[in-house]
Amino acid sequence: MLAGQADIAAGSHSWGNVGSRPSVFEGTPDAVYAPPGQPLEIAASSELCEVALCWAPADRGAEPALMPASGVKPFKRGSGNTERTIHNILMEDRPAESLLVTEVLTPAGNWSSYPPHKHDTDDEPRETYLEETYYHRTARPEGFAVQLVYTDDRSLDEAIQVGDGDVVLIPRGYHPVAAAPGYDLYYLNVMAGPRRRWLVTTDPDHRWLLD
């Protein structure tokens, strides 16, 4: 649940008034996991109701489950002007077949997904292949951020200005984000791949930043 509340049914399970925050910038999210092959119903139960449907191909999945906001423990990643807050929603510690979901809050003027990393090669335990999307929201509607998407050989080399509600697909390569000064940034990451592990490779040019 991005914001507001909804009644949700997945298979034979149902939950009322799922959702506990007025916006993505206030608090942690409630979420519901629904496996493949079972019906999913969502009905708004508040005037404001914003829902993100995050899905990936799967054959079996796991049992339907409510993942309450109280179970999402915020933590910091980075420091100084790379500090951001992470809300892990459906990562490796929760059952699913291929889906990984997390959200990140980046203060105005800070960099995120930084130092730049990638996960486009199946080379476990160094790196896993994961497709990914970024769903961006800005704390003010006129706000913006900049997302880079590039590869080592620069066969892909894009700088994208993103606004409130924009989605960026990461087909491959490194993908750092910068929040414009004055505009706090939220993004929802949805990832999936043949191996459900988040293992990344940092851009060698910037690996020294981790020392």
Residue ranges and their predicted role:
Residues 1-18, 108, 120-166, 172, ...:
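Glycine- and acidic-residue-biased ligand/ion/polar-headgroup-sensing regions
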Residues 15-29:
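A cross-kingdom feature marking solvent-exposed beta-strand/loop segments within repeated
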Residues 25-45, 56, 161-182:
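Conserved metal-binding segment of the jelly-roll/cupin
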Residues 30-32, 38-40, 47-51, 99-102, ...:
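Generic beta-strand structural signal
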Residues 36, 44-46, 53-57, 90, ...:
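Short, structured patches in soluble enzyme cores that scaffold and shape functional sites
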Residues 41-42, 59-63, 110-113:
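Short, well-ordered, mixed-charge alpha-helical segments that flank or form enzyme active sites
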Residues 48-94, 150, 188-211:
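Double-stranded beta-helix
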Residues 82-133:
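A short glycine-rich, His/Asp/Glu-containing loop-to-beta-strand
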